[in-house]
Amino acid sequence: MIKAVVGANWGDEGKGKITDMLAKEAEIIVRFQGGANAGHTIVNNYGKFALHTLPSGVFYSHTTSVIGNGVALNIPVLIKELNEIVSKGVPAPKIKISDRAQMVMPYHILFDQYEEERLGGKSFGSTKSGIAPFYSDKYAKIGFQVNELFDDEHLKEKLKSVCETKNILLEHLYHKPQLNPDEIYAELMEYKKMVEPYVCDTSAFLWNAIQEGKEILLEGQLGSLKDPDHGIYPMVTSSSTLAGYGAVGAGVPPYEIKKIVTVCKAYSSAVGAGAFVSEIFGDEADELRRRGGDGGEFGATTGRPRRMGWFDCVASRYGCRMQGTTDVAFTVLDVLGYLDEIPVCTAYEVDGKEIHDFPNTSILEKAKPVLKTLPGWKCDIRGIKKYEDLPENCRNYIEFVEKEIGFPITMISNGPGRDDIIYRNK
């Protein structure tokens, strides 16, 4: 059976922990989209890790980790992560890389930086990981698949052609130094040595695993509101963040994805520019940011302070719907234990009217939050294992959110560790 773990919101919902937890029962973990532009934080017996490319299941010796064809593969980042976890005592994981995965090229990161510089104050808040230039090339059909590393003559010819085009942009738009195809070729030969032991037809591998009845987990990146079609465009990422794309990015039949665990944070946070209706500011935001996440709310990739807000029922309901949610994992609930009262955004006000459906970006930018305040529980809930042992006000908060979003909350995370979880049967 295939399960997917995906995000309901802007990313940073705690997917890494939930994937790490569900990986205990899985035999194969697959990254199916995105690149090193977002990090998943894992806390386990080996320490604390921020993974950007490796699937979160690499800490279990019984699992195989797959980098699917939909991933923007930054090979040096992948190998650096692999070496780092092994150096900290983690047994060398079993890894397979799709021969159809496309590579983040050295110049993609440069073009990302140059474009952000050119846009100045109108930039998209990119992590400068080369993601937008990578996907631009992928869909312009001038990207490089991993399998092309093994066809020397073709690779040299294609590099020469692509560099000619790129150099026109570098000279006339960005006024930056030109690319040298021979230097890039030499770098790619280093990449080839790094990945050669892992490259295979991962789609065929997964198909065989499905036939054998193996448990497969698809690990998504970011969240629904960062999807290029259904998110807050243009403040989105460049690949689909939805579970439905898991079939495409992993190379598996869509009907095999039977369970979709959508991870939803007990409050809101976002990195980068764009509309954020329930956002809070000043001391209130600083306090939540300081207490939040695992050691504070700062981006796992950039280290930037995350923007903070109250739980947004409108955005989360929409995010869960777009994912096709079967189960909600409700995370970082323990963080809210310091509050006397907890505001929740239940609707948006736009031009004097109340709306409950998540709108497109032009309307969203005019929206103001309609807040309902719930009583806090004023205690530490870490260490609690049973739902009925949570304080009454805490249970009321969970049940209020569940009713508002319309999807069952079956897992509650009440701490950063993999065992800080409460299962709730619905």
Predicted features and spans:
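Non-transmembrane, aqueous-exposed alpha-helical and coiled segments at domain scale
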Residues: 1-426
